[in-house]
Protein backbone atom coordinates (compact mmCIF):
# COMPACT_ATOMS: atom_id res chain seq x y z
CA UNK A 1 0.00 0.00 0.00
CA UNK A 2 1.17 3.48 -0.83
CA UNK A 3 0.24 5.80 2.02
CA UNK A 4 0.60 9.56 2.02
CA UNK A 5 0.57 11.86 5.04
CA UNK A 6 -0.50 15.49 4.77
CA UNK A 7 -1.89 18.35 6.84
CA UNK A 8 -5.65 18.14 7.26
CA UNK A 9 -7.96 20.79 5.84
CA UNK A 10 -11.41 21.83 7.04
CA UNK A 11 -12.83 19.66 4.25
CA UNK A 12 -11.24 16.64 5.96
CA UNK A 13 -13.16 17.16 9.23
CA UNK A 14 -15.97 14.68 8.41
CA UNK A 15 -13.46 12.00 7.34
CA UNK A 16 -11.34 12.61 10.46
CA UNK A 17 -14.44 12.35 12.66
CA UNK A 18 -15.47 9.10 10.95
CA UNK A 19 -11.96 7.65 11.29
CA UNK A 20 -11.87 8.48 15.01
CA UNK A 21 -15.34 7.03 15.58
CA UNK A 22 -14.40 3.82 13.77
CA UNK A 23 -11.08 3.53 15.62
CA UNK A 24 -12.45 4.21 19.11
CA UNK A 25 -16.04 2.95 18.88
CA UNK A 26 -15.27 -0.50 20.27
CA UNK A 27 -14.09 1.10 23.54
CA UNK A 28 -17.47 2.64 24.44
CA UNK A 29 -18.79 -0.50 26.10
CA UNK A 30 -15.49 -1.27 27.82
CA UNK A 31 -15.05 2.13 29.46
CA UNK A 32 -18.74 2.94 29.89
CA UNK A 33 -18.67 6.18 27.92
CA UNK A 34 -17.43 7.60 24.65
CA UNK A 35 -13.67 7.98 24.60
CA UNK A 36 -12.68 11.66 24.62
CA UNK A 37 -11.52 11.66 20.97
CA UNK A 38 -15.06 10.74 19.90
CA UNK A 39 -16.37 13.92 21.53
CA UNK A 40 -13.95 16.35 19.88
CA UNK A 41 -14.89 18.91 17.23
CA UNK A 42 -12.45 18.20 14.43
CA UNK A 43 -13.25 21.37 12.49
CA UNK A 44 -12.06 23.26 15.58
CA UNK A 45 -9.03 20.97 15.98
CA UNK A 46 -8.01 21.50 12.35
CA UNK A 47 -8.30 25.28 12.75
CA UNK A 48 -6.50 25.50 16.10
CA UNK A 49 -4.01 22.62 16.24
CA UNK A 50 -1.77 20.47 14.09
CA UNK A 51 -3.91 17.82 12.45
CA UNK A 52 -2.67 15.36 9.85
CA UNK A 53 -4.29 12.61 7.83
CA UNK A 54 -2.90 9.48 6.23
CA UNK A 55 -4.50 8.55 2.93
CA UNK A 56 -4.58 5.41 0.87
CA UNK A 57 -5.74 6.05 -2.70
CA UNK A 58 -7.33 9.34 -1.63
CA UNK A 59 -9.25 7.84 1.31
CA UNK A 60 -8.48 8.95 4.88
CA UNK A 61 -7.33 5.87 6.80
CA UNK A 62 -5.60 7.58 9.72
CA UNK A 63 -5.70 10.84 11.63
CA UNK A 64 -3.32 12.53 14.03
CA UNK A 65 -3.86 15.53 16.31
CA UNK A 66 -0.86 17.22 17.90
CA UNK A 67 -0.68 20.13 20.29
CA UNK A 68 1.49 22.08 22.68
CA UNK A 69 0.51 22.36 26.34
CA UNK A 70 2.17 23.45 29.57
CA UNK A 71 3.42 19.85 29.87
CA UNK A 72 5.07 19.88 26.46
CA UNK A 73 4.40 18.44 23.04
CA UNK A 74 1.18 16.41 23.09
CA UNK A 75 0.23 13.52 20.85
CA UNK A 76 -3.46 14.21 21.45
CA UNK A 77 -5.24 11.77 19.12
CA UNK A 78 -4.02 9.00 16.88
CA UNK A 79 -6.70 7.01 15.06
CA UNK A 80 -6.49 4.32 12.39
CA UNK A 81 -9.39 2.84 10.46
CA UNK A 82 -9.84 -0.73 11.80
CA UNK A 83 -9.25 -2.41 8.44
CA UNK A 84 -5.83 -0.69 8.39
CA UNK A 85 -4.72 -1.83 11.85
CA UNK A 86 -1.29 -3.52 11.85
CA UNK A 87 -0.53 -2.24 8.34
CA UNK A 88 1.92 0.55 9.20
CA UNK A 89 -0.46 3.53 9.32
CA UNK A 90 -0.04 4.06 13.06
CA UNK A 91 3.74 3.79 12.78
CA UNK A 92 3.79 6.49 10.09
CA UNK A 93 1.83 8.82 12.36
CA UNK A 94 3.89 8.06 15.49
CA UNK A 95 7.11 8.77 13.58
CA UNK A 96 5.64 11.98 12.18
CA UNK A 97 4.56 13.13 15.65
CA UNK A 98 8.08 12.58 16.98
CA UNK A 99 9.61 14.42 14.01
CA UNK A 100 7.24 17.36 14.55
CA UNK A 101 8.14 17.51 18.25
CA UNK A 102 11.87 17.53 17.47
CA UNK A 103 11.47 20.10 14.71
CA UNK A 104 9.66 22.38 17.15
CA UNK A 105 12.46 22.08 19.71
CA UNK A 106 11.01 19.53 22.14
CA UNK A 107 13.11 16.75 23.65
CA UNK A 108 10.11 14.60 24.55
CA UNK A 109 6.55 13.88 23.53
CA UNK A 110 3.68 12.84 25.76
CA UNK A 111 0.22 11.33 25.45
CA UNK A 112 -2.53 9.97 27.60
CA UNK A 113 -4.89 7.07 27.15
CA UNK A 114 -7.73 5.60 29.19
CA UNK A 115 -6.56 3.08 31.78
CA UNK A 116 -8.89 0.44 30.29
CA UNK A 117 -7.29 0.79 26.84
CA UNK A 118 -4.57 -1.62 27.90
CA UNK A 119 -3.57 -2.64 24.39
CA UNK A 120 -2.70 1.00 23.66
CA UNK A 121 -0.49 1.14 26.74
CA UNK A 122 1.33 -2.02 25.64
CA UNK A 123 1.86 -0.59 22.15
CA UNK A 124 3.17 2.74 23.44
CA UNK A 125 5.57 0.98 25.83
CA UNK A 126 6.91 -1.08 22.91
CA UNK A 127 7.82 2.11 21.04
CA UNK A 128 9.52 3.78 24.00
CA UNK A 129 6.83 5.55 26.04
CA UNK A 130 7.04 5.34 29.83
CA UNK A 131 4.13 5.88 32.21
CA UNK A 132 4.65 8.91 34.44
CA UNK A 133 1.24 9.72 35.91
CA UNK A 134 -2.38 8.64 36.35
CA UNK A 135 -5.16 11.20 36.61
CA UNK A 136 -8.93 11.35 36.79
CA UNK A 137 -10.02 13.96 34.22
CA UNK A 138 -13.44 14.56 32.69
CA UNK A 139 -14.67 11.38 34.39
CA UNK A 140 -11.94 9.34 32.70
CA UNK A 141 -9.08 7.50 34.39
CA UNK A 142 -6.10 8.44 32.26
CA UNK A 143 -2.62 7.01 32.02
CA UNK A 144 0.00 9.60 31.04
CA UNK A 145 3.04 8.41 29.12
CA UNK A 146 6.12 10.21 27.82
CA UNK A 147 8.88 9.36 25.36
CA UNK A 148 12.28 11.01 25.39
CA UNK A 149 13.44 11.95 21.90
CA UNK A 150 17.08 11.67 20.83
Predicted region positions:
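Short low-complexity, flexible loop/linker segments enriched in glycine and/or proline
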Residues: 125-126, 147-149
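Flexible nucleotide-binding loop
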Residues: 87
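Conserved active-site alpha-helix within GNAT-family acetyltransferase domains
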Residues: 91, 103, 116-133, 138-141
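Acetyl-CoA-dependent GNAT
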Residues: 3, 7-77, 81-83, 94-96, ...
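Short acidic donor-binding/metal-coordinating loop in glycosyltransferase active sites
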Residues: 80, 113, 141
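Conserved GNAT acetyl-CoA-binding A-motif
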Residues: 101-113
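Accessory recognition modules or surfaces
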Residues: 91, 109-110, 144-148
